[in-house]
Amino acid sequence: MAAGTLYTYPENWRAFKALIAAQYSGAQVRVLSAPPHFHFGQTNRTPEFLRKFPAGKVPAFEGDDGFCVFESNAIAYYVSNEELRGSTPEAAAQVVQWVSFADSDIVPPASTWVFPTLGIMHHNKQATENAKEEVRRILGLLDAHLKTRTFLVGERVTLADITVVCTLLWLYKQVLEPSFRQAFPNTNRWFLTCINQPQFRAVLGEVKLCEKMAQFDAKKFAESQPKKDTPRKEKGSREEKQKPQAERKEEKKAAAPAPEEEMDECEQALAAEPKAKDPFAHLPKSTFVLDEFKRKYSNEDTLSVALPYFWEHFDKDGWSLWYSEYRFPEELTQTFMSCNLITGMFQRLDKLRKNAFASVILFGTNNSSSISGVWVFRGQELAFPLSPDWQVDYESYTWRKLDPGSEEAQTLVREYFSWEGAFQHVGKAFNQGKIFK
């Protein structure tokens, strides 16, 4: 049975995974989370700590036998028993599946939505709305899976349940008000069942579900930012007095989103939004206002209002149209997994939204599907090479530039933007679509 010390900071949801697992397995885990024994941001940067845990990340676990391991999922696995890990190869694979799903699909939108409400990340309206839709998709996926199941894998709690519950915890506490979560009764039932297990309660205490969706508080965010030392100024002109204030505003925009004591390094990376050079700054101004088209598209009828507006105002010199197809349709199996490919790409392209719009569609059924889309980009070239952050997915697609004046472009834009039409070039029925805006 594992025994050792867990280094973390207080109320770290990532550490909860290992602590709940230990409650089930009987592993003896001591927690060091506060001075003088452990000071996050200091202790974890000392040479002694880094010799044991080179990444300097928490949570980190040191066994009484000297064994050291970091990364919360690895620690939770180590302190678990066979029942939690999955007692058969199939069950173990499904546990890993849900643990991976929590990290790849739940953490990004949950962080984007929740962090601003806690004052540790600046609010971006479009990003938040996108995150809400992604959370809604995730809860729906879980709801369908749990319709005939008590737990995610098998008939007992496993690491799958522990991990996904902990990943959803702040969503349920901060933003999933009754009107939002009521559409997912099976997910809610499962979540409540888990958090009311004695082993969960021993770590989480009584979890109070959100009654009213928390909102971004600009004042709280400003107060949470690290205070910078500024040189003292002698009294001078009005411009000299105003300059430090302007500089402080810029520092707030570019600053890391929270003090080190509030987040681990992974969360700091998710929340940080450094001020960067605009990759499109070299392009001349355009008469086409993409945001206005997006408003038309979101709020008006696509065929009768949004598309006529698009073609009337589209600047073919300042913008370009592209058709894309996924290169490896033979690898597409379950349609929900194929949709995850699209959603994951959109998430990684989040900072491209101001200069792009797309409708990407999944056609076909399980084990016989394809993905293709129509994109609008600022400039005359593909935007992806302009930033390393945008280059993860695009090579998995073929790209063909469209002539805005051609009949083909008119047809593709109409069909893909409206999700209606024959789609004769595809040869498969429309399944579902995703909009990048």
UniProtKB/Swiss-Prot annotation:
Modification sites for N6-acetyllysine: K147, K212, K401, K434
Pfam family, one: GST_C
GO MF term set: translation elongation factor activity
Ranges where the GST N-terminal domain occurs: 2-87
The keyword Ubl conjugation appears for this protein: yes
Keyword tags: Acetylation, Elongation factor, Isopeptide bond, Protein biosynthesis, Ubl conjugation
Basic and acidic residues bias locations: 221-254
CDD domains: GST_C_EF1Bgamma_like, GST_N_EF1Bgamma
Modified residues (N6-malonyllysine): K434
One GO biological process term: translational elongation
InterPro entries noted in UniProt: EF-GSTs (IPR050802), EF1B_G_C (IPR001662), EF1B_G_C_sf (IPR036433), Glutathione-S-Trfase_C-like (IPR010987), Glutathione-S-Trfase_C_sf (IPR036282), Glutathione_S-Trfase (IPR040079), Glutathione_S-Trfase_N (IPR004045), GST_C (IPR004046)
Record-listed cross-link Glycyl lysine isopeptide (Lys-Gly) (interchain with G-Cter in SUMO1), residues: K253
Residues carrying N-acetylalanine: A2
Residue location of crosslink Glycyl lysine isopeptide (Lys-Gly) (interchain with G-Cter in SUMO2): K285
Region annotated Disordered, chain positions: 221-268
Residue ranges of domain GST C-terminal in the record: 88-216
Assembly information from the UniProt record: EF-1 is composed of four subunits: alpha, beta, delta, and gamma.
Purpose of the protein: Probably plays a role in anchoring the complex to other cellular components.
Entry protein name: Elongation factor 1-gamma
Native source organism of the sequence: Equus caballus (Horse)
Gene: EEF1G
